[in-house]
Design a protein with these regions (language model features):
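Terminal amphipathic alpha-helical/low-complexity segments used for targeting or macromolecular assembly
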Residues: 1-66, 125, 131, 139-142, ...
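Flexible, glycine/small-residue-enriched loop-and-beta-strand segment within the central core
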Residues: 47-50, 54-176, 203, 210-211
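A short, terminal or domain-edge coil/loop segment
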Residues: 146-148, 163, 168, 190, ...
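C-terminal/domain-terminus segments
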Residues: 176-200
């Protein structure tokens, strides 16, 4: 990135951050935290950033500032959000955890907890309705009483490109949702969903294969053609 396009701000530069619509709070022991912001970024809802740790980086790219709250609770966490459209998020990023959101269509309401040494990745063209929750761990430990050892462990969550997540969906650790798939309202995702499938239920199960979606309703032919091309389904 060129210097005139990206601006690096210390988390202590409160007046400059406020010019971008960012309110930042550093808790005791927080230092060397950096926020990167694109010049010309528009703020519609305002963003609260909370640091509790050191050497964290939040990189905000694109035309629109995400709204909501980012809480980085530990050292060496990283957040990269690149969006030209609405993103409203409440994310908790722990020690050496990573949050990556790349050019979504829109995220109207995401609550996420990204545990130490795990990642949450959301690909381009994704559409999230309100009330979506994503966890990369169970938060507490389950112990096998025969061995005295923990049997549940954290795991990454990956949402590939052009995925539609309906309202009030919960996505749990070690889950991957493949390109172009759809997850129905109030579903609970506990593993891998292949590309171009419709899943719903608690736990989520496949309702239909070889499907995808477009944002228009009724569906516009140009959007169908664009979607099919993106999924490499058009014949030459």
């Amino acid at each position: 990135m060129t210097e005139d396009y990206r601006r690096a701000l210390s988390s202590l530069d409160t007046s400059e951050l406020q010019n971008f619509g960012i309110r930042c709070q550093n808790f005791s022991g927080s230092e060397d935290n950096i926020i990167l912001v694109s010049d010309g970024m528009v703020s519609q809802r305002g963003l609260e950033i909370n640091f509790s740790g050191a050497r964290n980086e939040i990189d905000l790219r694109g035309l629109q500032l995400p709204g909501g709250r980012l809480s980085v609770l530990g050292d060496e966490g990283s957040v990269l959000i690149d969006t030209d459209s609405e993103v409203f998020i409440d994310a908790y990023v722990y020690k050496r955890a990573r949050l990556l959101i790349q050019k979504p269509r829109a995220i109207f309401g995401l609550w996420s907890s990204i545990t130490e040494n795990t990642s949450l990745s959301i690909g381009s063209g994704a559409l999230f309705a309100e009330g979506v929750k994503i966890f990369t761990s169970d938060h507490h430990s389950v112990i096998d009483l025969n061995t005295g050892k923990q049997i549940n462990f954290p795991g990454d969550v990956t949402i590939e490109n052009d995925v539609w997540i309906a309202s009030d969906v919960t996505i749990l650790k070690n889950s991957t949702i493949g390109k172009g798939s759809v997850v129905g309202a109030r579903a609970v995702v506990t593993g891998s969903i292949p590309s171009m499938e419709l899943w719903s239920g608690h736990p989520a199960r496949c309702l239909k294969q070889h499907v995808s979606w477009v944002p228009s309703h009724p569906a516009e032919p140009a959007q169908i053609e664009h979607m099919m091309a993106g999924l490499n389904l058009l014949s030459n």
